[in-house]
């Protein structure tokens, strides 16, 4: 079956969905039979397209859906897979199928050819599941289960102990951690005893000074280490946020590049057409132009302020 027959069938299916009648299913089955396509397959695409357009209406219409936080609906992915399978079985190229299904031609999907093609390959390679896919946005952190503790590591890969929370009330000061309190008392008592022993011997003042100086130096290094560990964790968090934002901006740039390319092609096709073709194509051209401008963030309400 040639490419034109596939296109006619999909075009008829879209027409019957846009303007449903009592004989819609009959017309589709008849055309599928004449084109050599399984009638059940054609009817399945008709049902999927109907359900997809109904889902779009539930989201407030095509414009609101295109600017919603959903990138792909589950039913939309099922329809995408079915349309590609029909065309590929008849030796159509993926590039041609993407163009035919996109906003540039039959407008079955409110997507550009590259968006359709990329998503089809992701489905084929099972990189994505057939489910509602939200648009990616930066700065969002996944929710973790309650009481789940994440260990922090320093620049050497060692686990950093959790920060000690000082007691805030007298009751907490008395009973917050008896074992910790005992260890600190024993440690300080030992230091005090050693200092006293050194001080009892004449001429040992320098040793006492060196000991206290060493303790001070070690405690200072410990404080600096804690500060460095905290800064390192902060930098890691900031780096991850910047990486997410950069990925989002790249995705946005790719989308806008596709939309701009589509806009240029639409304007060029119209500008270089004959006068008669321009008059006939003006309504469709205007509609396509509005959709593409909306994808670029240009709306009727804001274009004068840009």
UniProtKB/Swiss-Prot annotation:
Alphabetical UniProt keywords: Cytoplasm, DNA-binding, Repressor, Transcription, Transcription regulation
InterPro entries: MogR_DNA-bd (IPR021009), MogR_DNA-bd_sf (IPR038245)
TM spans (from-to): none
MF GO annotations: DNA binding
Gene Ontology cellular component list: cytoplasm
Family annotation (Gene3D superfamilies): Motility repressor MogR, DNA-binding domain
A Pfam family: MogR_DNAbind
Coiled coil: none
Source species, domain of life: Bacteria
Key word Transcription regulation present: yes
Location relative to the cell: Cytoplasm
Cysteine pairings via disulfide bonds: none
Function: Transcriptional repressor of flagellar motility genes, such as flaA, during extracellular growth at 37 degrees Celsius. Binds directly to gene promoter region and probably prevents RNA polymerase binding. At low temperatures, MogR repression activity is modulated by the DegU response regulator in an unknown mechanism.
The protein's name in its UniProt record: Motility gene repressor MogR
